[in-house]
From Swiss-Prot:
Lineage top rank: taxon: Eukaryota
Organism: Acanthamoeba castellanii
A Gene Ontology term for the protein's cellular component: actin cytoskeleton
Taxonomic classification: Eukaryota, Amoebozoa, Discosea, Longamoebia, Centramoebida
Protein known as: Actin-related protein 2
One term of GO molecular function: ATP binding
InterPro entries given in the database record: Actin, Actin/actin-like_CS, ATPase_NBD
Gene: arp2
Amino acid sequence: MTDSSKVIVCDNGTGFVKCGFARSNFPASIFPSMVGRPILRSEEKFDNVEIKDIMVGDEASKLRSMLQITYPLDNGIVRNWEDAEHVWNYTFFEKLKVDPKDCKILLTEPPMNPLANREKMVQVMFEKYGFKAAYIAIQAVLTLYAQGLLTGVVVDSGDGVTHIVPVYEGFSLPHLTRRLNVAGRDVTRYLIKLLLLRGYVFNRTADFETVRQIKEKFCYVGYDLELEKRLALETTTLVEKYTLPDGRVIPIGAERFEAPECMFNPALVDQESVGVGELVFDCINKADIDTRAEFYNHIVLSGGSTMYPGLPSRLEKEIKRLYFERVAKGNKVSMQKFKCRIEDPPRRKHMVFLGGAVLAEIMKDKTAFWMNKSEYEEQGPRVLRKCF
């Protein structure tokens, strides 16, 4: 085992776990962050897969129609530690096939994560798995590393939570960080609701995965909502057909752009917040005046929920509109000097992991950066000061 392969990088998302080793260009394994327990133990095997009392990740996803599915993470925070440990067991022993006692681990976490959550995570890594050393990195900072930047604003939207995080010279700025509890899972739920209004009922946990696939295949963000609504109403150009697992074919029309709209208008999913465009504008506008130009120039998208076609151009349009109304106060001359650039790297779905793999490779021999096991045994949770 080389030194790099002894450093595990694990990005635990609300929807998916991306795990692998330092220096790799792609996660060694990506699987759903879900735990399933059989509803009925009527048979031992199904579709050549053994039905076990606890099923995790890909195997749970495969048999999801027969299982009671739970997600250990919600809004980026671990809510169920027992299930989280099942997910980590699956990660280390089934997927990566490593002995944690020989390895170091780099974990990721969302900004504004509760301290208790972070302390418990370190405790589990050292006491249950016996890792030699651990490091916890903030996801947004890793995204910028992967993009080759030290300063910028990261719009990180995964399955459970969306964060807008300004990072200056490699340090995230917590006082300017904005959090929006609308992300991929909410878009899927909203799409279920829109399809329900059309008479298609999806209510089991298995159906949730089906609708998620519909969302990933067909949804996009509309640049001009009025135009999209007219197109949906007066023509059939937006209609796409999707074949459900039971063979039924359903048409998807206006729902394609209506579902992701909840990210720009959270009131649609009963969240009291402004949309993602206004949050980015607000966060940059409250930053020091001499950093704003650089922030506007480096708005980096990250996470699976930024993959919708049309999202980068709509975000740019929203930011420019708000700048024109609130900063330029309608002055078209000052708008000519305003530069706003949205960076949408093609591999942004895995940006956090890629940044983690880069950082872990740089740090692997530098003991000063890591929290090691002996320090943890001596100091307890206070050892976290090394990371933050």
